[in-house]
Amino acid sequence: MGKARGVNSGGGESSLGYLFGSGESVPKPNKPNAKTGFTTTTTTTTTTDGAGGRPKTTTTTTTTGDKNKTEENSAGVRGSPNNYYRSDGQNCGNFLTERPSTKVHAAPGGGSSLGYLFGSGPCGSDK
């Protein structure tokens, strides 16, 4: 008979235990508490409206802190000193590589630039 399902045929220990559940607990790294210069205070007050006797809730949120601290970027937003304004958009020009553009320069059905490959002259001419 063949092997039962899930039976290993030998070899070294799998490094995929994290994926398939090796039974060992992975220690989590200790993260220091994030310290910010801001404090947020929320106050909720409930009063009774005199006209209809309905409860009226007022919530006040106050944020205090040091506004002179360096601005922090959101997650995924990279602050770079090389971030300059490009008038044509971010993907124009060869600012990443010195390779030529792959932009199509001829209309469909127009003159072919593959004459060097097939040994023919310009489109429509007979040699």
UniProtKB/Swiss-Prot annotation:
- PTM-bearing positions, type Phosphoserine: S80
Keywords in alphabetical order:
Microtubule, Phosphoprotein
Name a GO CC annotation attached to this entry. Answer: microtubule
Compositionally biased spans, kind Low complexity: 39-48
* InterPro entries membership: SPR1/2/3/4/5 (IPR039613)
On tissue specificity, the annotation reads: Ubiquitous.
Superkingdom, taxonomy of origin? Eukaryota
Q: What residue spans carry the region label Disordered?
A: 1-127
Q: Where is the composition biased (Polar residues)?
A: 80-94
In the record, biological process GO terms are: cortical microtubule organization
The similarity comment for this entry is: Belongs to the SPIRAL1 family.
Summarizing the function annotation, the protein's role is:
Acts redundantly with SPR1 in maintaining the cortical microtubules organization essential for anisotropic cell growth.
Q: What is this protein called?
A: Protein SPIRAL1-like 4
Lineage of the species this protein comes from: Eukaryota, Viridiplantae, Streptophyta, Embryophyta, Tracheophyta
Gene assigned in the entry: SP1L4
